[in-house]
Amino acid sequence: MIKKLTLASIMASGVLYADTIGGEISFGIYSHTPSGTASYTLPHTTLGSEVDLENDFGWSNDQDIMLKAYFELPLPFMPNVKLAYSNLNQDGTGNVTDFSWGIISGSGDIETDLALQAYDVTAYYELLDNVVELDAGLTMRYLNGDITVTPTVGFDFTTPIGSISSPTIGVPYPTDIDMWIPMLYGKARFNVPNMDISLQLEANAISYEDTTFYDYELSARYTFSMGLGLEAGYKSIHLDSEDLADGLVVDIDFSGPYASIVWDF
């Protein structure tokens, strides 16, 4: 009898342990349309003109990838973990007048490029877990990339050509972005009763001194068998900051639809 009770206890604890282990992995593609302004002023100077991302830089709709992985840990008081990666790429051409960006100053044609990667590590707690699910926590986001401006043939420089700091036609001039940003994290999901459909809002946000940064995803999901599902929704990113790089000021938005393949295990 004792052996049977012990075996039953082990099996019960094993089921309980297995029940508490879970997670989710998703891979998606999101479409983003830019809007807003940016400027880059060399340190200790007053130069630097504000440019419009669409009209001056020629940025338009583009597509990029996004990855997310959630791990629900079975340890008491230990937070769950979410890892995420997304990239944000834009490129375009524009014709500018009285343009000033770092050491580039003048009028004419330019090529521009944004290459930005975001890496998230999120620790969160599950506050509700039934028809309504609610998570809250803290995200540490690492931004790495650059904004590059290249003056092309025909650009009329107003800075003296030939000086040590003078720009050159056809040479790209990147402005590097490299920083960590702490953000508050939250997720709310409504599981429609008796259906394999759920509605979800997930967001990160922070506002301090010269920076306001937030992103959110509003989505609907249909789950098939074995935890596999499809998710579609709307993703928006807003960044208003003077802290990305010394002299770089941005007030930009990227938003558009996205779709993901999801595995809930």
Indicate residue ranges for each PLM-predicted region.
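Transmembrane beta-strand segments that form the barrel wall of outer-membrane beta-barrel proteins
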Residues: 196-211
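Repeated loop/turn-to-beta-strand initiation elements of outer-membrane beta-barrel proteins
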Residues: 77-81, 131-134, 194-199, 227-230
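Outer-membrane beta-barrel "beta-signal"
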Residues: 22, 253-265
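Cleavable N-terminal export/targeting peptides
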Residues: 1-22
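Transmembrane beta-barrel strands of outer-membrane/channel proteins
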Residues: 25-31, 81-87, 136-142, 188, ...
